[in-house]
């Protein structure tokens, strides 16, 4: 996003980068990944924690769609909001592009369903956008050979009335196994990586 903004500012064009298939729709995907509990759909290597995405302000400006800022508005007004040092470096994006919006007028998205039909298909469905209310379902398909998918051909989460009732077991840090001498990257039939599945 920052490269595209810099190219547009300096050269008047991003050279077609923002027109790459799926790039502009990735903002809506990120928005839908947060459930009504405030937790993220944590498939593959993803954690369930959510955070602010300052790039959403650029997307909202570029697409002329302030509803993309709905989750940002909630996140930035929470009392327990904090940023890591890595996240803090992107906060100026909020100042630059956020000045184009009146956050009091940001409304939730109208749509309640998002689907992605790629190699790893994803469907995200909700009954509303207010935290702690309604239902949220995230479903992921795919293949066991997809990168970072943990041999998982599918996953889902289900939330109702502010409670996550079902979810993927989540990721395990690679180091926790590697420090025990497990050779995770050996995909042979008799490789040690498969032993980790037996000891769950």
Where are these regions (language model features)?
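A short, polar/charged loop-to-alpha-helix boundary motif
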Residues: 174-183
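Conserved small/polar residues in nucleotide/adenosyl-binding loops
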Residues: 198-200
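Carbohydrate-active enzyme catalytic cores, enriched for enzymes
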Residues: 2-166
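Residue-level structural signal for beta-strand termini and adjacent loop
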Residues: 170-171
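Membrane-proximal cytosolic segments adjacent to transmembrane helices
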Residues: 190-192
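Canonical bilayer-spanning transmembrane alpha-helix
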Residues: 184-188
């Amino acid at each position: 996003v920052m490269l595209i903004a810099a190219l547009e500012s300096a050269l008047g064009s991003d050279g077609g980068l923002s027109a790459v298939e799926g790039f502009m729709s990735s903002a809506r995907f990120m928005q839908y990944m947060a459930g009504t509990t405030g937790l993220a759909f944590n498939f593959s290597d993803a954690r369930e924690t959510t955070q602010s995405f300052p790039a959403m302000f650029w997307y909202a400006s570029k697409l002329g769609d302030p509803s993309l800022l709905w989750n940002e508005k909630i996140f930035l007004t929470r009392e327990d909001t904090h940023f890591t040092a890595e996240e803090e470096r992107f906060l100026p994006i909020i100042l630059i592009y956020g000045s184009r919006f009146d956050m009091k007028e940001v409304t939730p998205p109208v749509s309640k369903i998002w689907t992605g039909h790629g190699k790893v298909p994803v469907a995200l469905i909700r009954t509303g956008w207010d935290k702690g209310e309604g239902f949220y379902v995230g479903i992921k398909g795919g293949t066991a050979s997809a990168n970072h998918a943990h041999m998982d051909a599918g996953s889902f989460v289900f939330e109702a009335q502010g409670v996550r009732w079902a979810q993927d077991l989540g990721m395990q840090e690679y180091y926790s196994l590697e420090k025990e001498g497990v050779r995770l990257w050996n995909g042979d039939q008799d490789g040690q990586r498969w032993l980790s599945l037996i000891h769950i």
